[in-house]
């Protein structure tokens, strides 16, 4: 397919067979890759970034529809249809052996690749107080908060960018639960090499439950992730 390359990695993942190599050009791939076929121990299926760390698979989308709300806080509205059957802004982090309060969502807001801190209310978002437990307290004043507009079926996100214009800066939100993971089990002998994998809205993964992650084998064997 060198003369007529696929537009999406997942297009290749649907048809790749044992022994195939999928070479991925540099760029940002905003998609979920769901490999369908397993390789074999003597004939792996390999997904390789042509340029090491040049191909980025991200679970986020850029948002440029922010409007000023109050002080340093902006607000945007996102149609829930964007998220499909998994909305990171209605899904909480919780589960077995998770002992913190279940008040944080799996989604997040990013300003120039820096994750903002989730607030418990719009007021908290506006106040932008330091979170003392943070390893970088000065960054913890960048806050976000979310709520649902049931009538319009929209996710509403407020964010405090401290004077930055979110429509000019690179501001992203999580959209996808995973970046590279088979939806079915037993898709073995896969190699994934040289990618940046980032910004998926994964759930909590206790040892006795579904092992979620930005990238993972989903109960398959013989994987190499490098």
Locations of regions flagged by a protein language model:
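Extracellular polysaccharide-degrading/modifying enzymes targeting complex plant/algal/animal polysaccharides
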Residues: 1-226
